[in-house]
Curated annotation (Swiss-Prot):
Part of the 30S ribosomal subunit. PANTHER family: 40S RIBOSOMAL PROTEIN S27. One of its GO terms (cellular component) is ribonucleoprotein complex. Its cofactor is Zn(2+). GO terms for molecular function: structural constituent of ribosome; zinc ion binding. Gene3D superfamilies: Zn-binding ribosomal proteins. A zinc finger (C4-type) spans 17-39. GO terms for biological process: translation. This is Small ribosomal subunit protein eS27. Zn(2+) binds at C17, C20, C36, C39. Binds 1 zinc ion per subunit. Disulfide bonds: none annotated. Belongs to the eukaryotic ribosomal protein eS27 family.
């Protein structure tokens, strides 16, 4: 079967840091540790496929 268009199977998330309440956009399949740009709190850690999110998800972006 040939795909006529490429489906986007990955998402970005808008998350809120639990410490400083900064909103930040991160990739769902992050391959490195994602820190908050304001306070340095860890927002996501890599887990093979999808990242383990340590922050509140506000919205899914495609």
């Amino acid at each position: 079967m040939v795909r006529l268009y490429r489906e986007n199977r990955s998402k970005f998330y808008r998350v809120k840091c639990p410490d400083c309440e900064n909103e930040q956009i991160i990739f769902e399949k992050a391959s490195t540790v994602v820190d908050c740009v304001v306070c340095g709190h860890v927002l996501a850690e890599p887990r093979g496929g999808r990242a383990a999110l340590k922050a509140e998800i506000l919205a899914e972006l495609e």
